[in-house]
Amino acid sequence: MQVKETRFAAVAGTCLACMLAFAGVAAVASGEEQKASADNQAREVIADAAFEYDQYGVIDASYWADKFPLEYNSYLMTAMDVPLEYGEYIAEGNVDTTSVGTDLLDGDYTSTKVNFLDEDQYPEIKTLGKGYGYAKYYTEPGGHAYSVWVVANNGRLGDLSESKGKVSCYACKTPQVHFDAANYEGEGSYWTQPITEYKDAFTENVSCANCHENEDPTTNAVLREDWIRAMGDDLDETTVANAACGQCHCDYSMAPTVEEGSDAPFESGEPVSPYYGGLASMNAEDALAFYDEYGFSDWTYASTGAQMLAVRHAEFEFNYGANPSPMAQMGYTCADCHMGTVTDEETGVEYTDHNIQSPLDKPELLASCNTCHTDLASEVASIQEDIDGRTHELGLRAEQFIFNFEDKVAIPDADGNLVFDTDTALANGLTEDQVARLQEIQRYACYYWNFAAAENSEGAHNPDMFNDLLEKGNALLDEADEILGVSSIVEA
């Protein structure tokens, strides 16, 4: 691909600066540097870093700390967003060698995160995701400073020394994996290589190199190749900053095995976003059509035979996709709402804050929002209460539908686990066509639910899009209820 010939051409030999640490405004350090332009700073950094590269190029954010301390130190603040089980991990005597900024916690690793599988949260996930990693472990996410640690400690992969996971699990957790993929010359697809062989290979968390250009580090860029394909002609200098966020904050799945001679626009195991036509195709319907075309599923639901799909958090689609959010239509960027420009109290220098958070958690940003909104916090809370509640209701209804479906088509195996059985389905009065349609409904309805449930704003980004997804999910379950002759609606 062209991106390999240009974007990664300098890796492992003549790479100058893989990325500027969090450029975006002309933020400078001190003294004479405060008078330098962003371009001059970039040249200085490149000169200083020319000999500080490894096989991936210069990807370590700490290389830029002395030149861009304001951006770098604000990035370290993402360590304040502690993952749920991090404190327990440290208390057990483990040493974390990859996360950064944890010294800012002063030994207090208390987390405010929740386990979404708990009974007072969204326990339906255990049923809707049965057979997939989501049913094993699903917590509120922590900060970017912990992204590599999370891969090894998220409860889905287990011990990486014995895990069946693949390198693709790191796709949105470290920039290193993309540089490695671009230069891979081994057997088969890089993305399907066993994670056991790479468990100690990655040390850099989500940082500078994920979002900033190599040769001109004052600009943004996209690392993930398939996202470049999915964006198509819509990836340009006006969209690249949002697309840099979107390459991870989008829906993607790990591609199935690609047969030799296939015209599939991806390789085996590659993280794939299910879109062809740029922004106009970025909606749930086009995604489902893409997955259907390639016969793709993340897993087979054992008790019903449905071919299931898992959705990652599709913030980009909710904001900039086929049905843009109100804020996107007004021209706002991800950075406007989740980063913002702040002024250093000591030097008076303005810089882009890289402690990426909800604007509700940033007083300066919230004050700016409230120049248009009367009370943004209350507005968001009202939207979230409504949409998150109805998303939960759809999840509970989809769960009950699965139970109803199982009653018609499943029998216990030798270990007592329910498995799909065609003869049982026919004996219970279903036709083969009805079974196929019910399996399709499970695939689609759960996808609509998952598309909404996994998006981190809980409705705030794009209420209209959430409403559309929930309506479509419920309409499918209405059809399923008619086929099965029993209601899936769960009374509150």
Task: Tell what function each PLM region has.
Residues I483-A492:
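Long amphipathic alpha-helical segments
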Residues Q2-A17:
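N-terminal Sec-pathway targeting helices
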Residues V150-K164, W191-E204:
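Membrane-entry segments of alpha-helical transmembrane domains in multi-pass membrane proteins
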Residues V151-D180, E185:
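A cross-kingdom signal targeting lumenal/periplasmic-facing segments of multi-pass membrane
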Residues A26-P141, A182-N205, N210, E215-D336, ...:
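Primarily the internal scaffold of c-type cytochrome electron-transfer domains
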Residues T14-V28:
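Hydrophobic alpha-helical membrane-insertion segments, chiefly the h-region
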